[in-house]
């Protein structure tokens, strides 16, 4: 009964929000006569002067998300860049562990330089077969990922029964 009341309250809230979202566009923007435009706020349509002011840019023609961070990175020496991932972060780079390179995702121990293969993500023990991701105990059947004591093909188990 409580779930039914919660669903009814949420539906009523969605209905109220959708009704209140219908606003009239000013005459300045009335040149767009499509049926979907009254559902968008007038702030969604900017003049060209407003658009230029709204986008911060320090270099012409390009938009940098974190210009201060990029300037600091470019000013650093090669020695300082080696430990760059320890103190600072860059947008769009996902780092695990101490050091990270853009486009490289590392978990656990560092791979040996002799056997490091680009595009291979390793977890736990090293697998003999390329393209096989191994967790926990070794499986005798291909395509079976085993967790715990018993496992069935196609069943992934975590924790207790």
Curated annotation (Swiss-Prot):
Signal peptide as annotated in the record: 1-21
Propeptide residue interval(s): 22-80, 111-113
Highest taxon in the source lineage: Eukaryota
GO cellular component terms, semicolon-separated: extracellular region
Keyword check for Signal: yes
Modification type Phenylalanine amide: residues: 96, 107, 123, 135, 147, 158
Main location: secreted
Family designation: Belongs to the FARP (FMRFamide related peptide) family.
Protein name, UniProt field: FMRFamide-like neuropeptides
Organism the protein comes from: Ascaris suum (Pig roundworm)
Name of encoding gene: AFP-1
